From Swiss-Prot:
Pfam family name, one: NadA
EC number in record: 2.5.1.72
GO molecular function: 4 iron, 4 sulfur cluster binding; metal ion binding; quinolinate synthetase A activity
Subcellular location: Cytoplasm
Domain of life from the UniProt record: Bacteria
Enzyme type, top EC level: transferase
Family: Belongs to the quinolinate synthase family. Type 1 subfamily.
Cofactor note: Binds 1 [4Fe-4S] cluster per subunit.
Descriptive protein name: Quinolinate synthase
Organism (species): Burkholderia thailandensis (strain ATCC 700388 / DSM 13276 / CCUG 48851 / CIP 106301 / E264)
UniProt gene name: nadA
Pathway listed: Cofactor biosynthesis; NAD(+) biosynthesis; quinolinate from iminoaspartate: step 1/1
Amino acid sequence: MQSAIKPVEYDRPLAAGAACGVGEAWAKVPAPLAAGEREALKARIKALLEREKAVLVAHYYVDAELQELADETGGCVADSLEMARFGRDHGAQTLVVAGVRFMGETAKILSPGKRVLMPDLDATCSLDLGCPVDEFSRFCDAHPDRTVVVYANTSAAVKARADWMVTSSIGLEIVANLHARGEKIIWAPDRHLGGYIQKKTGADMLMWQGSCLVHDEFKGIELDLLRNEYPDAKILVHPESPEGVVALADVVGSTTQLIDAAVKLDAQRFIVATDLGILHKMRLAAPGKTFIEAPTAGNSATCKSCAHCPWMAMNVLSNLADVLERGHNEIFVDAAIAERARVPIDRMLDFAARHKQRVQASGDLLRDQQLFANVGAA
């Protein structure tokens, strides 16, 4: 059975990056598999990983079965940068990246001598789509006095135009450091994450107006109603969410930080405002606790993604097996672009090392206290 095609709308910043229109893209909807097919594919994938001496590197947002395969075969399930670092440091010469295209590109930039494959090269990201390099370069050229800071969710070409790359777990600290040095900033592409960091640091930040189509759907009105229904629940929010959602959070953090909070916080119930793919890892990490999806439907909300990235959903058992069997869907990054893009990535890694801070949480809430910058009433 062939995959269907799903139209997807996303925020498309207009000229100069100061206003937003609507862009149109598409995502494949994979054909469902019977239970017997799934088990056969899992066994085939395990054998192919061994045959190809490959390692599976998966994001928290992909299908639970792919996350399980990564864990069972000595791979990695992590956020985008930890995926790339794992691939760089692992002995395998073939990395299979289950995620979206910018993750494969970042893995290739950090592991230029390795073969990087992806189940589907068309798996993209609304933040990446909403920040075309030509338009972004013109935006930067119009403000030459500003330091360019881009989020990991961008193409290699956009990273190559930047001074710094950040992830959601260290962006606050890097921007605070730049602000303390008196630097004015261009921030791209996520306006919600940028606004959160700007509010926390007071930095002079000129924003590109992109957004994640998953997190942008969460709305404060419905979340507040759900909180009233479950007053004992802690609210975990990714900072790509709108300001009204962040304001209701008990913890704001990256994917890794939210998982860590679910384990460490003294609560039995959590409302989670990020891609529902993360719930698999949360349930494994904190068995016995209850996780409730933050609402993406209601009077003020929509359900364009229903809290699951349509491009992450393109990573499935069938195309994972196929890419291992055929060795296609290889990621290539132009050498000149890769060389320039590695500069802002290495700056972030060097900053983290100098400040003795991992880019993801360490697992110790006391040690990571500064990462949980937005803690509301219990």
